[in-house]
Amino acid sequence: MSIGYKDNLMSTILAKDRKCEFPINFECSPSQITLMPEMFSFNNERKYQTLIPLMKTSHLIDDDLKDKLNKCAFDFFSGKQANRTSDGTISRLTASGKTSPILPLQNINIVKAENTGNGKSDPYSSIKISKPTKTVIKLKSTKTNTAGQRTRHFCKICSTGFTTSGHLSRHNRIHTGEKNHICPHEGCGQRFSRHDNCNQHYRTHANKKKRNWKRREASS
């Protein structure tokens, strides 16, 4: 069914209780559509009520008009249901000066969910909006403070920080040039400032011995 001429018509659709009314703007003539309560079915098990034309009367309504009706009905009922939960809380917070009317949900932590038609609350309808608390900020600052306390030992030459005095003394050998650790291999005599570096160097001699021994076995 095509809509012939354009006319801004404010129609009223009665909900199930026949008390809630809302305007819908669409382009059609009043004679082309008749809105009756029995033309629409209500789904009480869903969180939001939507107006769905029944099969016996759906041929009377154009497809474009069906989309407009369902969209307006969804927006109306969703806005009404949201206002039931948030109007009281927002008005109290606005009156006390804790929040601004522009951002009413800025300081709201939890909004209780309304019961749906089957008597169970929707677990996804609760809203949690919170700012970082003082406890979290304290923990972060404590972590940085403890990290600063760990580096208590500083080099007097390059100002590098270390956690223990042993690490600092080991670092000072770089500046002084001390090499107290000598390679125990015969004929090597190479000196190192760190013991682990000396051990690592000594393993190279042991690996050379193993390689030479394997070559001798292979040749024999």
Swiss-Prot record:
Its main location: nucleus. One of its GO terms (cellular component) is nucleus. It is found in: Nucleus. The keyword Cell membrane does not apply. It comes from the Eukaryota. SMART domains: ZnF_C2H2. This is Probable transcriptional regulator NRG2.
